[in-house]
């Protein structure tokens, strides 16, 4: 993957109400005072899945006419609705379908099909409330609009033609706020060359699908958001002014500005990561400063934790216990350092410096590509991409950390070295993570790890002739589903069985 434009960040890190400096660059390689070794695997009870337990669920899509596996659009948008997997299928010929699966061929069926419209709009944004499944889909009469399903064909219908006629509606931020759906309608206004942002809610009926607030055309609503409890958190930036955090619970009274974060102008949120009741994010300022923030969705619980100046790039990893974890990467030395920042306030502390074998070979800046933490987990799994002066990376690596130097381990390298396909990282438990990796013998295939080097291995060689390019790992009950390109010459629905009864490791087939 090519260089991702990041915000420049600094040597100086300041905790709330106090100051503290990062170590000088020449000391980076010696920050870790204890060896970086494999962490102890926690007793989560889940075992490494097997190749035998990894099977194609159903052949849904015909052979691809595009014929480029990494571009194949297989089943996706996985969501749990009433205890059953639901997902979208978008065919190359323009047809669309809402599907469901119980994990068997016979139990994998189409709920509702949509004929091709020629618009290119996808069936997408599946969002479940306790009793209704909302999604966006196109038809010839209404364009791409909001639909709802109760899980049956008869109970799947258009909610409302939000933009009357065949013109598409551009809907974003679909989020369940209890039994209510909240979302934004974005409309480009050609008269002022800006976008109008409107916050809407829906109860699944046309009459109950109404606008909550018109934010107008003088602001920009970030594509980043967070779900906390039954509320949606989102960021609003005045085009010539401040950036603020907002929340909505689907009511007019519950749609409020939580806090004004920065006076601006040109301040943008990045790396929004939620763990339990806490969300971390960073603000990037035009001055080159970057700030680490935390929020629990209240004004009092929305606080700046640290500031970083313009000589380093910063990525947010997440929170473990009493600390937030970030990485800082020096633009001059090209070393990445993990820091922990007290959530209660205080100076950041270095944890460990990650190795970089390419610092003397020109452009080789590391950055975080993906992060995953199991619900309630005590470890962070993350992928590091080491860039180059071209579109493809020099290296890609899977790491795990429990917040200590000794518990920070390189599990696998390389992952994907393509600039057109990045490896997903999906932690099911502290001792089970799914990802994809490259091997000379198999290409890019699904892999698993229990958080140790010895417990990191190929799950299954799905496409014996090439790479299967797995996408969208998703746990539903005792299975993990994903999309993979296989011998049907298209990406199909696959799953692997989770187990609490461990067996001796097998050779992946």
Where are these regions (language model features)?
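C-terminal motif of bacterial Sec signal peptides marking the signal peptidase cleavage site
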Residues: 15-17
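Feature 14080 marks short, conserved micro-sites in well-ordered regions
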Residues: 37, 43-509
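Bacterial N-terminal signal peptides that target proteins for export
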Residues: 1-8
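Bacterial signal peptide processing site
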Residues: 19-21
């Amino acid at each position: 993957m090519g260089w991702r434009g990041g915000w420049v960040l600094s040597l100086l890190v300041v905790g709330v109400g106090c100051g503290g400096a990062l170590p000088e660059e020449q000391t980076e390689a010696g920050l870790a005072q204890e060896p970086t070794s494999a962490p102890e695997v926690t007793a989560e009870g889940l075992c490494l899945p097997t190749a035998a337990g990894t099977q194609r669920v159903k052949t849904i899509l015909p052979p691809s006419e595009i014929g480029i596996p990494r571009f194949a659009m297989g089943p996706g948008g996985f969501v749990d609705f009433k205890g059953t997997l639901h997902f979208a299928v978008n065919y190359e010929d323009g047809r669309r379908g809402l599907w469901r699966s119980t994990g068997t061929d016979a139990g994998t069926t189409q709920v509702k099909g949509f004929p091709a419209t020629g618009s290119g709009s996808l069936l997408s944004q599946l969002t479940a409330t306790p009793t209704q499944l909302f999604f966006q889909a196109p038809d010839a009469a209404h364009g791409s609009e909001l639909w709802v399903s109760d899980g049956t064909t008869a109970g799947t219908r258009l909610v409302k033609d939000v933009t009357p006629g065949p013109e598409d509606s551009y809907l974003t931020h679909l989020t369940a706020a209890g039994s209510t759906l909240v979302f934004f309608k974005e409309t480009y206004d050609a008269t002022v060359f800006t976008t109008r942002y409107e916050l809407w809610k829906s109860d699944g009926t046309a009459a109950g699908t109404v606008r909550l607030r018109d934010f107008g055309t003088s602001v920009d609503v970030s594509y980043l958001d967070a779900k906390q409890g039954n509320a949606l958190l989102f960021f609003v930036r005045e085009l010539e002014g401040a950036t603020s955090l907002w929340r909505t619970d689907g009511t007019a009274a519950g749609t409020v500005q939580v806090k004004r974060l920065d006076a601006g102008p040109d301040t943008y949120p990045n790396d929004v990561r939620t763990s339990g009741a806490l969300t971390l994010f960073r603000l990037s300022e035009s001055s080159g400063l970057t700030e680490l923030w935390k929020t629990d969705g209240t004004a009092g619980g929305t606080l700046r934790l640290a500031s970083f100046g313009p000589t380093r790039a910063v990525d947010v990893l997440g929170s473990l216990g009493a600390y937030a974890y970030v990485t800082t990467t020096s633009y001059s030395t090209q070393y990445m350092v993990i820091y922990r920042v007290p959530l209660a306030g205080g100076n950041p502390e270095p944890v460990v410096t990650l190795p970089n074998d390419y610092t003397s070979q020109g452009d080789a800046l590391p950055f975080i590509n993906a992060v995953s933490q199991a619900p309630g987990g005590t470890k962070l799994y993350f992928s590091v991409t080491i860039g180059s002066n071209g579109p493809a990376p020099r290296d890609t690596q899977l790491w795990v950390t429990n917040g200590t130097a000794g518990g920070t381990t390189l599990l696998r390298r390389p992952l994907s070295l393509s600039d057109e396909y990045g490896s997903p990282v999906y932690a099911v438990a502290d001792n089970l993570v799914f990802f994809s990796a490259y091997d000379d013998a198999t290409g890019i295939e699904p892999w698993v790890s229990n958080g140790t080097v010895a417990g990191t291995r190929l799950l299954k060689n799905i496409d014996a002739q090439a790479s299967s390019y797995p996408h969208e790992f998703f746990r539903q009950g005792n299975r993990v589903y994903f999309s993979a390109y296989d011998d049907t010459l298209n990406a199909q629905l696959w799953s692997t069985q989770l187990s609490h009864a461990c067996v001796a490791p097998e050779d992946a087939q």
